[in-house]
């Protein structure tokens, strides 16, 4: 006969965050001694960290504050919904924003002000909930920065985040910069201007466009014009300023920004589980 009650299991779950079967097994193994069961689960959690290190993390969230953005990964979206996970993410990004943290090693070693580093706090939570959790990346931009965070579902935290660093003043400029951030989130631009696109990438696109036109049987005399048109199409896909605006497809992003007196200097886009 079990020497513990359902109330004991519930209390142990609430205290440790462990699964129901883990709590039942711990109480059974310790002959119903609650304190020993807590200790046993904590030891088990520490041992499981090594096993979790081999597992993949494709879920999680993106958080941003004051020009700093971080991505923290979990194994499942169930954990991404977890209040403690989200609260810790907010604590980490707040500390990162205050310190203007710009690289992953510094983020992991970041002092959270409660005696823990960001990485130690995350691994402590990982041991409690039984999933691999990891700090994946961080970026810090300067000057005025517009932020946009996008949720894939209403019950999930943001999975896509964009920071846009810009030059401009006033509410209209801030609104235009945020619209540009939404644009980057939706259409995944990689560069601000075509001058930023590496020459070898442009040349490769040009070569592919010309070869494709030849294989389609296009007239030799028309190849240069067709090739140039397709390369320009490539630029519209990857260059922010040349994309049609998602809020007004009769204008390019550049036209909208010019009207608001805004110059985008750089941007960063994070998407959970993506490069």
Swiss-Prot record:
This protein's record includes keyword Cytoplasm: yes
Keywords, comma-separated and alphabetical: Cytoplasm, Elongation factor, Protein biosynthesis
UniProt cross-references to InterPro entries, sorted A to Z: EF-Ts_dimer_sf (IPR036402), Transl_elong_EFTs/EF1B (IPR001816), Transl_elong_EFTs/EF1B_dimer (IPR014039), Transl_elong_Ts_CS (IPR018101), UBA-like_sf (IPR009060)
Residue ranges, annotated region (Involved in Mg(2+) ion dislocation from EF-Tu): 76-79
GO cellular component: cytoplasm
Cytoplasm found in the keyword field: yes
Molecular function terms, GO-annotated: translation elongation factor activity
Cellular localization per UniProt: Cytoplasm
Similarity comment text for this entry: Belongs to the EF-Ts family.
Function text: Associates with the EF-Tu.GDP complex and induces the exchange of GDP to GTP. It remains bound to the aminoacyl-tRNA.EF-Tu.GTP complex up to the GTP hydrolysis stage on the ribosome.
HAMAP family, per database record: EF_Ts
Protein name: Elongation factor Ts
């Amino acid at each position: 006969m079990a020497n513990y009650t359902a109330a004991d299991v519930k209390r142990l779950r609430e205290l440790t965050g462990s699964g129901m079967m883990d709590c039942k097994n711990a109480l059974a193994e310790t002959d119903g001694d609650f304190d020993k069961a807590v200790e046993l689960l904590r030891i088990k959690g520490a041992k499981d960290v090594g096993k979790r290190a081999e597992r993949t993390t494709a879920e999680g969230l993106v958080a941003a504050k004051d020009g700093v953005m971080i991505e923290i990964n979990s194994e499942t979206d169930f954990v991404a919904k977890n209040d403690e996970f989200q609260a810790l993410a907010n604590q980490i990004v707040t500390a990162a924003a205050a310190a203007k943290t710009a690289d992953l090693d510094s983020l992991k070693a970041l002092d959270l002000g409660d005696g823990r580093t960001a990485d130690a706090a995350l691994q402590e939570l990982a041991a409690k909930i039984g999933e691999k959790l990891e700090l994946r990346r961080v970026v810090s931009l300067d000057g005025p920065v517009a932020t946009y965070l996008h949720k894939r579902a209403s019950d999930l935290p943001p999975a896509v985040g964009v920071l846009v660093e810009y030059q401009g003043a006033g509410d209209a400029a801030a609104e235009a910069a945020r619209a540009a951030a939404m644009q980057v989130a939706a259409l995944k631009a990689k560069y601000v201007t075509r001058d930023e696109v590496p020459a070898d990438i442009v040349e490769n696109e040009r070569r592919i466009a010309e070869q494709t036109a030849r294989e389609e049987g296009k007239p030799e005399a028309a190849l240069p014009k067709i090739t140039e048109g397709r390369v320009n199409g490539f630029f519209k896909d990857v260059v922010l300023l040349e994309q049609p605006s998602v809020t007004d497809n009769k204008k390019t992003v550049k036209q909208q920004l010019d009207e608001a007196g805004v110059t985008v200097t750089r941007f960063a886009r994070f998407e959970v589980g993506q490069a």
